[in-house]
Amino acid sequence: EGDRVLAEWALEAWARQTNPSLEMVPGPEESATIRVYWVAAGEGMYGEMRARMVDGRLAADVFVHPDTESLGLDIAQRARLDPLFRDTVVYLTCVHELGHAFGLPHTGAFSDIMYTFQYGGDFVAYFMRFREKLDAWDDIRLASPFSDADSGTLRFLYPQRGVS
């Protein structure tokens, strides 16, 4: 249940980045535009997004690996000691992969939620930046995971309706 809530909060976080907010409506799995699946982790894999077609429109399957034990010793140890850190990793992975579902590419800016570690970087520091905003689990929903660039890219892809 907890991870499912984190995924719902990640969807809500993206929806709030547009004006008006994107509307997220649950629907049948077979026709859903975005589907989120929890899967066993591949070594070092946080998640992935795969595009697909549904009724002639682009859709996405998001796969999240919630087991932090396979994400390297530093991440695994910190997640064992700090449940909010573990949930931060899962939440930010959901946000990142959902970003791909909305059409955002990887970036090389460490401050972006769409940053890719292919450019290197400190994995723990990346997640701790968000974790440090949290005092309690419910704070995950309230703290923004986005850089200005993340928000700007989404607003570019989904411009305000009725404005040109």
Give the predicted meaning of each segment.
Residues D3-F110, Y119-D122:
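Metzincin-family zinc-dependent endopeptidase catalytic domain
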Residues P20, G44, G152, V163-S164:
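A generic structural signal for solvent-exposed, polar alpha-helical segments
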Residues L84-G162:
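The catalytic-center signature of Zn2+-dependent metalloproteases
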